[in-house]
């Protein structure tokens, strides 16, 4: 993951490269999600299976670097997540499996039924707001999902989502050993799939009993596994998402503690080489502002030509405020 720094600065001569990609990330995400939803609603299971297989082959990404696989599954899951009883998503999984008995996608969706029911029980508020009587039922559902995933582990040979789902289960069961063993196995089998690292990172955030040092460990692991083709890109990407999930980490970046700004800066240069989009430039601007790196911020600011995306910036970090602070 160590491309030369000159790559980033030479791109200043071609700002329209970023401009051309200014709206494609959001459009691409919507197209993928809507296509997955359309196949699901119409019951076109063969095309849905083909879509999932395609997105598991080489893990293609959007122009901004988001893996299409997670978007497809997000569209399907989101379609039924509002039904807290889990009946809607369960019915769909049953129909899918009946039509295509060998579908790994149908069984993957069956696993997600447990998650929908668990979220319906627990809600999405702080743990302190949950009725104590709910926890045994919640844990039971997570144990059942774990058992289902283990029974259907052959899915993991064809769909990397299995590992991501098991990491989520491990987080919800507060099973650190399961989370790390799943991460180790999954990253060995599918080293380039970002969301295996992202889900593990989320599960080891301080709010889930983890620490900044554990996030650093996972970010380093992701970077090491992908250094030959991606430089330090994964390091920056994992930490940016960690900061978005847990804004308190901004203090570490600002003070240059635990998080290496030198490595993050290099990682963004590497990522821009792969994904020269305004999404990447927004990531650079936000983190450069937090780290108080005026040089990097101003160079990226020239390239982005005002095409900022406020919704992807960490909580409390605002483009105009950052821009004014470096004048």
Show the residue positions of the predicted features.
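Bacterial N-terminal signal peptides that target proteins for export
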Residues: 1-8
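N-terminal mature-domain "stem" immediately C-terminal to a signal peptide or N-terminal signal-anchor/transmembrane
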Residues: 21-63
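Extended alpha-helical scaffolding segments
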Residues: 270-313
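Amphipathic alpha-helical protein-interaction segments enriched in hydrophobic
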Residues: 229-241, 276-287
């Amino acid at each position: 993951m160590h491309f030369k720094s000159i790559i980033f600065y030479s791109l200043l001569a071609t700002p329209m490269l970023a401009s051309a990609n200014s709206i494609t990330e959001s459009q691409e995400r919507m197209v993928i999600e809507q296509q997955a939803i359309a196949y699901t609603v119409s019951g076109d299971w063969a095309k849905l299976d083909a879509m999932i297989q395609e997105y598991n082959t080489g893990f293609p990404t959007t122009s901004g670097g988001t893996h299409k696989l997670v978007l497809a599954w997000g569209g399907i899951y989101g379609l039924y997540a509002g039904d807290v009883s889990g009946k809607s998503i369960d019915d769909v999984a049953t129909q899918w499996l009946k039509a295509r008995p060998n579908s790994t996608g149908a069984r993957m969706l069956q696993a997600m039924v447990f998650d929908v029911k668990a979220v319906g029980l627990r809600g999405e508020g702080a743990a302190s707001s949950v009725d104590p009587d709910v926890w045994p039922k919640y844990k039971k559902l997570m144990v059942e999902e774990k058992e289902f995933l283990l029974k259907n582990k052959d899915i993991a040979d064809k769909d990397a989502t299995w590992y991501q789902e098991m990491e989520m289960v491990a987080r919800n069961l507060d099973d650190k050993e399961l989370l790390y063993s799943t991460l180790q196995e999954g990253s060995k089998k599918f080293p380039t799939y970002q969301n295996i690292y992202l889900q593990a990172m989320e599960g080891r955030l301080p709010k889930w009993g983890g620490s900044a040092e554990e996030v650093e460990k996972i970010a380093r692991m992701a970077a090491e596994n992908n250094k030959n083709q991606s430089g330090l890109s994964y390091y920056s990407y994992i930490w940016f998402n960690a900061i978005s999930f847990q804004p308190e980490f901004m203090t570490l970046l600002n003070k240059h503690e635990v998080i290496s700004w030198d490595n993050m800066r290099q990682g963004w240069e590497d990522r821009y080489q792969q994904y020269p989009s305004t999404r990447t430039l927004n990531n650079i601007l936000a983190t450069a502002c937090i780290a108080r790196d005026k040089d990097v911020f101003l160079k990226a600011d020239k390239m982005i030509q005002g095409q900022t995306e406020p919704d992807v910036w960490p909580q409390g970090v605002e483009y105009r405020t950052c821009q004014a602070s470096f004048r």
